[in-house]
Amino acid sequence: IPRLSPSEMLLPVIAAAEAADDDLGFEEAALRVAAAAATAESGSSEAVRNPRRERRVDEVLRRIEAEPEEPLTLWQLAHDAAMSPYHFLRTFNVISGVTPYQFVLTQRLRCAAVRLRRTTDPISAIAYEEGFNDLSTFNRRFRRIMGMTPGAWRRRRP
C-alpha cells in the first residue's frame, strides 16, 4: 500500500471539518487532524484493541442510542468512557466503524425518520427536538442520508 503524504492524509479531515456544523463535529475534526499528524510522524495508524476500552465505548454507544438528541461533545463522551479524546475517537472508530459524530448524526436522523412517519408534529419541531441546531442543516443531512427530504419521507407513510 503506498504511503500517503501528510497533506494527502489531511484532505478528508479538512473536508469533514468544513462540513461539520456543531461542536462534536468540530472537536472530532480537530482530533483527526492531530491523529493524522501523529500517524504521519510515526508511520503507524493501527489502533490497539483493549477490552476495557471497548466496554467503555460500548456503554457510550448505548447512551447515544438511548438519548441521541442530547447535546454532546467529544470531550464529554471521552470523559464518560474514562479515556483521552484521542484514544476515545480511535477506539470508537475501531468498534463502530464510524466516528462519534457520524454515529450521533445517524441516530438523530433515525429517530427523526421514525417520528416523521408516526406523528404529525411539525418538521421543524422534530428537527430541533432530535438535536439539530437549525432546520436547513436537518433538511440537508436528512436528504443526504435518506435520499429524500423530510417532507417527502413523511408523505411516503405506509
Which residues fall in each region the model found?
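Short, well-ordered alpha-helices that flank and scaffold nucleotide-derived cofactor binding pockets
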Residues: 35, 39, 114, 140
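Basic/polar phosphate-binding segments, predominantly the helix-turn-helix DNA-binding elements
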Residues: 59-110, 127-152, 156
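Short, Lys/Arg-enriched, Trp-marked, Pro/Gly-tolerant hinge/linker segments that flank
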Residues: 1-81, 94-106
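Residue at a beta-strand N-cap/secondary-structure junction
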Residues: 71, 120-121
